[in-house]
Amino acid sequence: MTNNEIIAATDGSSLANPGPSGWAWYVDENTWDSGGWDIATNNIAELTAVRELLIATRHTDRPILILSDSKYVINSLTKWVYSWKMRKWRKADGKPVLNQEIIQEIDSLMENRNIRMSWVNAHTGHPLNEAADSLARQAANNFSTRSAHIPGPGWTERSAK
């Protein structure tokens, strides 16, 4: 870790998979965001959290460490994406890559940026992961009950530690 590296946790939640779903990214109490839908899968929610973090931070040149409890997301974005691109977005079995559109978008957002990803074990007390998990679950619950969803403050260089 460098001293100006942004450390952010991302998480997604789907109540029925597919069902009411939420996503969140979290840096600190002043720097986070969340959202969701009436129906989506957990993987779409997890990927959306990463995409939204990368969009929010697109104007910073600081390195970013993304913490995720989704091995699917980490493997998709750091390992499998290279072979999928070589195979024209087909898996080894010849079938199309699931969630291809959002994975392509994230891959583009990661281009020419210093982005690292690291897996964290879910629900083990990691403070950033727990915060992102809570916000994603709250967003999913808001969409489930059709309650108003209030997004977070988002990203500014000044607010991020």
UniProtKB/Swiss-Prot annotation:
Residues noted as binding Mg(2+) 2 in the record, renumbered to the chain: D11, D133
Domain RNase H type-1: start-end pairs: 2-141
Keyword Nuclease: yes
InterPro entries documented for this protein: RNase_H (IPR050092), RNaseH-like_sf (IPR012337), RNaseH_domain (IPR002156), RNaseH_sf (IPR036397), RNaseHI (IPR022892)
Chief location category: cytoplasm
Location of this chain's protein in the cell: Cytoplasm
Manner of cofactor binding, per the entry note: Binds 1 Mg(2+) ion per subunit. May bind a second metal ion at a regulatory site, or after substrate binding.
HAMAP family associated with the record: RNase_H
Protein name (record): Ribonuclease H
Organism: Tropheryma whipplei (strain Twist)
Gene: rnhA
